[in-house]
């Protein structure tokens, strides 16, 4: 399935998609297999309260091009566990691999005794048809993973929605951080599947006291720091300022290919493109979410400025999603967590893998990072 996804979408690395598929299946299964989801799930005789769970009904699940098979697998497993039928609507550029993932699950479900048609899929559909399915009176719940426009459309459908939208993830490398460790973890995360995880770091905020060391450590790992002229070349290639979205052509592509698209000469072994920036927002588009091995880089004079920068980055496209910090100072970590508007605050952890859960921490494994 991982190879099929790479062949069809031309995004990411199949070796990393294998890991995503494993998290979506094996890790999720081990996490929820003992959890009762239907019937009496809690009974408190002292308070005389009994909690009863029941299926919600047909689920309409929209899946993305960036994590196609893993998202299909995950949404099907949690739907079957809660006894809800599910209809998958895959991204048009990932329909074959997504349908194959759904077919594998459906055949396994039938062999295990599940009812016919418990898992269905729409191989092709227009935008109008997808909107009609979201608004259908028999749709009980929508699981919408995709762009801001898609998630907003789901919320306008009139049916209950769990929306999984974009993230613009800042990572702060504090003065007390173990810099070589921090850079290694960010490198592992941002190069994972060529940066297609929406929880991957988008902007580094270093402290003035350790900025030079951070730069040196990234260069050891073949990261390429862009000049101002190169940043100006890359911006229109990576981001559409008129539509305020990253360009599909760079999503999940290797750093060397993206540099070539922008007419930037980089060494053949370049792993990341890093853009030193001073501003945040649409006027500085590399500060926004780009699901590729591209990172913005800021230097803060002190902790207070670092917080302001991280809040700005978080605000521009990442509200409710993910933020990350590398620090050994517990008070600073707690303050950072309280200052960010994010569903997940990751500490001393690679954001891509850490946000998915089940590997670097004890967060529940999930391919739906809701915001």
Tell what function each PLM region has.
Residues 40-181:
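Rossmann-like NAD(P) dinucleotide-binding subdomain of oxidoreductase/dehydrogenase enzymes
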Residues 75-79, 103, 158-160, 188, ...:
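Short, solvent-exposed amphipathic alpha-helical segments in soluble enzyme
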Residues 1-50, 220:
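N-terminal Rossmann-like NAD(P)+-binding subdomain of aldehyde/semialdehyde dehydrogenases
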Residues 134-137, 178, 239-248, 286-289, ...:
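Short, surface-exposed amphipathic charged segments that create phosphate/polyanion-binding patches used
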Residues 91, 146, 208, 348-351:
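Short secondary-structure boundary segments
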Residues 264-371:
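Conserved C-terminal structural/oligomerization subdomain of aldehyde/semialdehyde dehydrogenase
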Residues 81, 100, 151-281:
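ALDH superfamily catalytic-core signature
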Residues 57-61, 77-78, 84-87, 117-120, ...:
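Structural motif
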């Amino acid at each position: 399935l991982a190879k099929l996804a790479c062949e069809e979408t031309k995004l990411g690395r199949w070796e990393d998609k294998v890991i995503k598929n494993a998290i979506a299946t094996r890790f999720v299964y081990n996490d929820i297999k003992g959890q009762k989801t239907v019937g009496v799930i809690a009974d408190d005789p002292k308070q005389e309260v009994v909690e009863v769970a029941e299926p919600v009904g047909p689920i309409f699940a929209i899946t993305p091009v960036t994590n196609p098979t893993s998202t299909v697998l995950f949404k099907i497993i949690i739907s079957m566990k809660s006894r809800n039928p599910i209809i998958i609507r895959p991204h048009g550029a990932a329909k074959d691999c997504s349908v194959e993932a759904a077919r594998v699950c459906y055949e396994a479900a039938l062999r295990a005794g599940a009812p016919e048609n418990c898992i269905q899929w729409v191989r092709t559909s227009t935008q109008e048809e997808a909107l009609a399915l979201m608004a259908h009176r028999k749709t009980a719940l929508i699981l919408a993973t995709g762009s801001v426009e898609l998630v907003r459309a789901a919320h306008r459908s009139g049916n209950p929605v769990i929306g999984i939208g974009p993230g613009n993830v800042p990572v702060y490398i504090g003065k007390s951080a173990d810099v070589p460790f921090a850079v290694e973890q960010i490198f592992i995360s941002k190069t994972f599947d060529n940066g297609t995880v929406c929880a991957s770091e988008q902007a580094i905020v270093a402290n003035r006291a350790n900025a030079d060391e951070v730069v040196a450590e990234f260069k050891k790992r073949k990261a390429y720091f862009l000049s101002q002229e190169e940043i100006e070349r890359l911006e229109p290639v990576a981001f559409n300022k008129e539509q305020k979205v990253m360009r599909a052509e760079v999503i999940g592509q290797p750093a060397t290919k993206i540099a070539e698209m922008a007419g930037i000469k980089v060494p053949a072994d370049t792993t990341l493109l890093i853009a030193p920036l001073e501003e945040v927002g649409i006027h500085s588009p590399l500060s926004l979410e780009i699901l590729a091995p591209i990172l913005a880089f800021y230097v803060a004079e002190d902790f207070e400025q670092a917080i302001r920068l991280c809040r700005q980055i978080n605000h521009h496209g990442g509200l409710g999603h993910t933020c990350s910090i590398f620090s050994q100072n517990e008070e600073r970590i707690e303050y950072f967590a309280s200052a960010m508007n994010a569903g997940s605050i990751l500490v001393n952890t690679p954001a891509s893998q850490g946000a998915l859960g089940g590997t670097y921490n004890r967060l529940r494994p999930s391919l739906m990072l809701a915001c």
